[in-house]
């Protein structure tokens, strides 16, 4: 009877080891959950960036204001009869 209890305890320990440390065990599950959380956060950031880019593309296709703004800021272009003033900081 004592031998049977020892064998059953050993088998139980093997199952517990596999449950906690084996493939698809608890530790593996926790690691996977952390990776999923990181990927969800990345996906959220990328989705927000995509929405901004899509809005900018729509504005460039449909509106003249976005094109004018880009021309003014990036290429320092002005309309006819318009004065361009550049304000710079003084270096001390």
Swiss-Prot record:
Could you list this entry's UniProt keywords, alphabetically sorted: Cell cycle, Cell division, Cell inner membrane, Cell membrane, Coiled coil, Membrane, Transmembrane, Transmembrane helix
Tell me which Gene Ontology terms the entry assigns under biological process.
FtsZ-dependent cytokinesis
Indicate the principal place this protein occupies in or around the cell. Answer: membrane
Q: How does it sit in the membrane?
A: Single-pass type II membrane protein
Q: Which NCBIfam families match?
A: PRK00888.1
Identify its protein family.
Answer: Belongs to the FtsB family.
> Which compartments is it annotated to reside in?
Cell inner membrane
Q: List the protein's name.
A: Cell division protein FtsB
The record lists the membrane-crossing segments as 4-21
Ranges in the Periplasmic compartment? 22-92
List the InterPro entries hit by this protein, alphabetically.
Cell_div_FtsB, FtsL/DivIC
Which ranges does the record list as Cytoplasmic topological domains?
1-3
In the UniProt record, what gene is named as encoding this protein? Answer: ftsB
What Gene Ontology cellular-component terms does the record carry?
cell division site; cell septum; plasma membrane
Q: Which domain of life is it from?
A: Bacteria
